Amino acid sequence: MKSFLTKGWRIAVAALMTSSLLFTAACGTSNNSAAPTAAQGDLTLVIGAYSVAKDAFDILLPKFAAHWKEETGQTITFQESYEASGTQARAIAGGFEADIAALAMESDIDKIQKAGFITSDWRKVGNGGMITRSIAVMGTREGNPKGIHDWEDLTRKGVKVLYPNPKTSGGAQWDINAMYGAGLKESEAKTGQKDPAYAKSFLERIHHNVESLDKSGRASMAAFEYGVGDVIITYENELLARIKKGIPYEVIIPKSTILIENPAAIVDVNVDKHGTRKAAEALLAYLYSEEAQRIFADNGFRPVNDKVMEEVKGNYKTPEDLFDISYLGGWAKVRESLYSPKGVWYQVLAGI
């Protein structure tokens, strides 16, 4: 087994362990969100993550625990909470003692940082702090019965659309960003410049056909699985993972869509309070490892590790006109222009 700890890490951990009395306990996970307690020598890491990450983390966390046990002799257990990204960010910023936050978008990590719980530059870790990528796509049932091929098709009469609520869901904000950005791209192609009014109208016409706004991306996906709606706007990985399990969905990649990047960060105040910094840093490093990135890929995500992405690139299609958050001006501008009380999204909701 290739160690995910550096030599320096192993020395530091060994020194730590010689001063601790170890007890043997079974490795496991829990969804209890209380502050952690652990037997002397053992550790509990608290994970606060967005709902879509759960399936991958169900595989990743036990594997990391086994590696850590082999490296250090120490047993790690996990307390895990999975919520809509915005809800999770507010919980951590409000005092939920997560050691690691794995969320849908960097602006949710920024909320925790602004609340004073993340004190380091989390973007300096790994791939700019991002552990996975995806794109915003549309999903239909087998055979694509409504003939959906691009965003414009979602505006047709009789087409029932699903996506979650951007007030609570980071995935929903990616969905809105994708549709609004596609509207900007279309206006730019027609006139040579971005037209926010056109993009807003484009978003309004799609939203007119929305069947429901669920709390999270996972809740929206569950509704679709129960037969609600004709088409779902979601992460590509949500559909690919289900197709791999034999569910006959169709992935519709729009001409213009957004690159999704999902961050993870250590919550400094909490790891220092719990004495779990070394283990938390090792877990975060593990999430960037080839083993972990392959597990993310198995769950439909696009890896951030170049070697792993090269191995699996045949599993993904490249959109004709892929843009990232910088096309919309970055998250700071997007928060103000789209999601502030006077932003485009709330104007669309209010019919202004």
Language-model regions: role of each:
Residues 1-43:
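Short, low-complexity disordered leader/linker segments with a strong preference
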Residues 27-115, 123-125, 235:
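Early extracytoplasmic/lumenal segment of secretory-pathway proteins
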Residues 113-186:
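A conserved helix-loop-strand patch within extracytoplasmic ligand-binding domains
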Residues 130-135, 200-207, 214, 245-278, ...:
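Periplasmic-binding protein-like
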